[in-house]
Amino acid sequence: MSPRRVTALVSLFSLSSIFVACSSDKSEKTDLTAELCPAKLTIQTDWFPELEHGGTYQLIGPSGTADKNSVSYSGPVQQQYAVGGLQEVEILTKNFDKQNSSVLVDAQADMAYIGIADLIKDSAALPLIAIAKTLDQDPQMLMWDPTQFTIKTPTDIAASGASFVHFPGLSYIDFMIDKGYLRPEQSDPSYNGSDATWVSKGGSILQQGFATNEIYKYENDILWKDGAPADVSFFTVSELGFDNYPATITMLKSRATELDACLKLLVPKMQQAWVDFYDNPTPITDRMIEINEEYDGFWSLSTELNLAGLQLLEEKNIGANSPDGTYCSFDETKIQDLYDILQPIYVSQGVEITDDVSSVYTNEYCQGAPGR
């Protein structure tokens, strides 16, 4: 064999070895990345499907499957959000039997919608951490019939003497009572999300709700006043001075630690889904109408309601970017201000909470997240 032939064979062998080694390294890295996330991700929301959950449903898109028995929506994650081996997403509606924090503790979901105010309240008792926002402002509101009550300022709520029907255990109720906006005897924690009490009482009560949903329903759909819909007035809780992050993506701290490498990849994708939803909400909001029909419960949506809700969401900056330009991170000053409001209230109630509010949230996983 000639020296030239030997040299050529050696060179060919060397190139082949390098190619195999590079291919092996690439394959190994791909395999490691593919195993970072669970194949199935379960997210517990705080209500039936509604536009305020749009970015979460965007992960699946309109082609998922609604299950009436489990009241859940599931399907393959859309390819543009697939990362770290994630294949399927399951979205659970509100669990009326337990708090969302208990759903996490019982390992029935990987993530759950929980507001920062409630995380503060439970901070000494439960090891939970918020990893991303879903909304920038809280659409939660207090509404009233303006023909029955003259309410111009928050203090007029207490002066009205009217019962305020709301869900139990809400932090903003503690705030309102502490500020003198609501007398303790006005608080009626019997709300179950339906319009039955309001209708039966002809709007002679105050009631909680989502400004981006119920305002349209009571003014256009629900026959509550003289056999017809009628105008209502409202304050959002932010307008009352309670500036909360609602429905944050929350996890058990131990689960977040376990999925740390996954979350660094996944959270920016989850927040991209929110940006994409806002850019083109109709496929998801239309599908939400159908999902609620398939659930066959008391909750319903309509095209007109969704359009009105999205308009109000923009007007009230409910879907605004964070100060750093992402649609993900938490404003440290905003959360500290909320903590400063709640801390003395809970001290007076004998409720133990953390001394360090930064322990209930992190912006670590928002690195690289997009903005609107």
Give the positions of each predicted feature.
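Bacterial signal peptide processing site
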Residues: 23-26
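C-terminal motif of bacterial Sec signal peptides marking the signal peptidase cleavage site
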Residues: 18-21
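Conserved C-terminal helix/tail region of periplasmic/extracytoplasmic solute-binding proteins
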Residues: 332-372
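Short, solvent-exposed loop/beta-turn-alpha elements that line the ligand-binding surface or hinge
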Residues: 64-84, 229-242, 257, 318-330
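Bacterial N-terminal signal peptides that target proteins for export
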Residues: 1-9
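Short, glycine-/small- and polar/acidic-enriched structural segments
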Residues: 30-192, 205-208
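Secondary-structure end/capping motifs
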Residues: 257-348
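Pocket-lining segment of extracytoplasmic ligand-binding domains
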Residues: 117-118, 192-197, 201-296
